[in-house]
């Protein structure tokens, strides 16, 4: 069976693994998932990202990050633009997540970037998800 929304599946897997405090998780790889994972790593939400080659599409291995006393670094993940209802924003209308404490993942003509980077580069795009 084909997957309708692979990005929502990725976010759900990360959310579920985070809730039960798993150290790592694996998911089917794609280019957009790699870009999202790299942003999560650079913004400090996850520890590391590995790409494992297999006979099919490859596997992304994400290593989740926890603070002192095993507290979660990722408090929330929310899919915004869905296959049935796409959400777009201009650079001037780019949303701030929790007044700048979180990030919005934005798919632009320059690839997947954060809301801060989109404002800086003055590009709009599709709001993929919020992470805080």
Curated annotation (Swiss-Prot):
Keywords: Ribonucleoprotein, Ribosomal protein, RNA-binding, rRNA-binding
UniProt key word Transport: no
Molecular functions per Gene Ontology: rRNA binding; structural constituent of ribosome
RNA-binding as UniProt keyword: yes
A family per Pfam: Ribosomal_S8
Biological process according to GO: translation
InterPro entries per the UniProt record, alphabetical: Ribosomal_uS8, Ribosomal_uS8_CS, Ribosomal_uS8_sf
GO cellular component: cytosolic small ribosomal subunit
Stored HAMAP family: Ribosomal_uS8_B
Recorded family membership: Belongs to the universal ribosomal protein uS8 family.
Function: One of the primary rRNA binding proteins, it binds directly to 16S rRNA central domain where it helps coordinate assembly of the platform of the 30S subunit.
Subunit structure: Part of the 30S ribosomal subunit. Contacts proteins S5 and S12.
Protein name: Small ribosomal subunit protein uS8
Organism: Staphylococcus aureus (strain NCTC 8325 / PS 47)
